[in-house]
């Protein structure tokens, strides 16, 4: 199997077959992200994709889930994605779901009919970096869209029958807008009903614009207590059915997961217990390690 550079996947895709169809990220301008900074965006050849599928058939002939790599394969045209999906079903006839990273910008390039066709071919459960529902935060993070566009494109996705997983970043609006960020993001999430929410807190590694902003003081990272407050309000406002809340990323102050609405009160209890446990550190700003991990 061919993989170029560092290959990323969501933690919940650990058992999926990883098939490279693009390299890098077509946007690659988010202010906080360095995942693909050194990997130019390119499209894998169908010859290589078919070669990898032939290899995959030898060790995972009954694979039921395929995750397309890398940063945002949904940047491909609908026709190209259809061609890839048909090849997947040819080599792996048990495959039911073809998932991948995408962005709001790449939904925009597909017609309603194309989205329906892709869903018919098993493309579903797209992982999307929503990050925030607050326009000021989206601008700061240089996402390339606003909340109105996100609501519209996610509505089109859902109308086509596609589920999506939402990545949400706490603290993305800065310490002065935590309440606004939590409220706006919860409103967007409630209106677009993802099947999964993947949370993290704002952080930046060297070589990205946000890192420079943090070092210069142009952006002030929220404190541990502020991160807890924002997550508590966000969670309180969620009104979803059968949605997995995945908060185990090491950048989180509170690490937990559960199903909404079933585990909502239990998770809120965990948030409040964490506030009590870290009472002496609530005014501190997180000390970060690899992948934004906070040592607590």
Regions found by a protein language model. Give the residues of each.
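Auxiliary Fe-S-binding modules of radical SAM enzymes
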Residues: 1-13, 190-296
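Canonical Radical SAM [4Fe-4S] cluster-binding loop centered on the CxxxCxxC motif
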Residues: 5-51
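Conserved, mostly hydrophobic/aromatic
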Residues: 25, 33, 49, 68, ...
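Aromatic/hydrophobic pocket-lining residues that form the small-molecule binding cavity
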Residues: 49, 81, 111, 150-151, ...
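Conserved SAM/AdoMet-binding glycine-rich loop
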Residues: 58-163, 239
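Short beta-strand segments at enzyme active-site cores
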Residues: 63-69, 127, 164-168, 197-201, ...
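Conserved strand-turn element in the central/C-terminal portion of the radical SAM core barrel
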Residues: 105, 133-137, 157-181, 200-206, ...
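Catalytic cores of alpha/beta
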Residues: 113-115, 174-191
């Amino acid at each position: 199997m061919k993989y170029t550079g560092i290959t990323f996947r969501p933690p919940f895709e650990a058992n999926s077959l990883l098939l490279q169809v693009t390299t890098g990220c077509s946007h690659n301008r988010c202010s906080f992200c360095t995942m693909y900074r050194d990997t130019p965006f390119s499209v894998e050849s169908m010859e290589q994709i078919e070669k990898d599928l032939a290899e995959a058939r030898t060790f995972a002939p009954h694979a039921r889930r395929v995750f397309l790599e890398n940063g945002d394969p949904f940047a491909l045209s609908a026709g190209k994605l259809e061609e890839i999906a048909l090849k997947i079903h040819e080599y792996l006839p048990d495959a039911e779901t073809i998932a991948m990273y995408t962005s709001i910008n790449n939904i925009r390039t597909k017609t309603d009919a194309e989205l329906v066709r892709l869903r018919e071919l098993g493309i579903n459960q797209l992982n999307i970096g929503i990050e925030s529902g607050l326009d000021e935060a989206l601008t700061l993070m240089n996402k390339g869209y606003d909340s109105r566009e996100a609501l519209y494109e996610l509505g089109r996705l859902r109308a086509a029958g596609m589920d999506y997983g939402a990545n949400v970043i706490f603290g993305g609006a800065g310490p002065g807008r935590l309440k606004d960020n939590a409220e706006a993001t919860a409103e967007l999430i409630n209106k677009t009903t993802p099947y999964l929410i993947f949370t993290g807190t704002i952080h930046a590694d060297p070589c990205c614009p946000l890192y420079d902003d943090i070092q210069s003081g142009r952006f002030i990272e929220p404190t541990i207590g502020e991160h807890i407050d924002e997550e508590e309000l966000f969670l309180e406002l969620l009104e979803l059915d059968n949605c997995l809340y995945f908060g185990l990323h090491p950048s989180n102050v509170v690490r937990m997961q559960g199903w909404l609405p079933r585990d909502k009160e239990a998770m809120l209890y965990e948030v409040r217990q964490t506030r009590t446990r870290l009472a002496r550190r609530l005014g501190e700003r997180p000390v970060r390690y690899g992948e934004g991990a906070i040592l607590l």
